[in-house]
Amino acid sequence: MGSEQSAEAESRPGDLNASVTPSPAKHRAKMDDIVVVAQGSQASRNVSNDPDVIKLQEIPTFQPLLKGLLSGQTSPTNAKLEKLDSQQVLQLCLRYQDHLHQCAEAVAFDQNALVKRIKEMDLSVETLFCFMQERQKRYAKYAEQIQKVNEMSAILRRIQMGIDQTVPLMERLNSMLPEAERLEPFSMKPERERH
């Protein structure tokens, strides 16, 4: 009985002196710890006929430009870098700088020519715009005069219609008068054209 009490005292969780060691059954099993006892129901696949494996084998292999800078290597090898001649690299950079300078000069020359041409075109367009404005003002005056002529023409047409309605009435009235009191026939033509 005393030994049971001492065993209980050791296994109490509130006791500070009790050493806690997890049992191996409570550990999570890893993939390496699992042992397959029975063969699965799947038929064994032939890896050489797998389309994904065939596609992976068709991918060509690539080598990095600087082999010393592979991700797996901790210290890059400077063997390839040491073979580059610094004078030749400097000459290459200077030639490239000269090429860029020439390109910049060509672009600046073309840009200045374009700016000059744009200014010339602006001046031409402004001159043409002023000329067209003057012309438009002139044509606006002509259009105003034509409008007045159209209004006068409409008035004259109304007068002509009134005369055309009045002349037959005058002739009828004139024919009712005695012979001695009759007027001469009415005519719109000037007197010299009548003779």
Curated annotation (Swiss-Prot):
Leader sequence segment: none
Source organism, top-level taxon: Eukaryota
Region (Disordered): 1-31
Membrane topology per record: Lipid-anchor
Post-translational modification (record): Myristoylation at Gly-2 mediates attachment to lysosome membranes.
Lipidated residues (N-myristoyl glycine): G2
InterPro entries in alphabetical order: TBORCS5 (IPR018780)
UniProt main location, coarse: membrane
Modified residues (Phosphoserine): S71, S75
Family: Belongs to the BORCS5 family.
Function: As part of the BORC complex may play a role in lysosomes movement and localization at the cell periphery. Associated with the cytosolic face of lysosomes, the BORC complex may recruit ARL8B and couple lysosomes to microtubule plus-end-directed kinesin motor. Thereby, it may indirectly play a role in cell spreading and motility.
Protein name: BLOC-1-related complex subunit 5
Encoding gene, per UniProt annotation: Borcs5
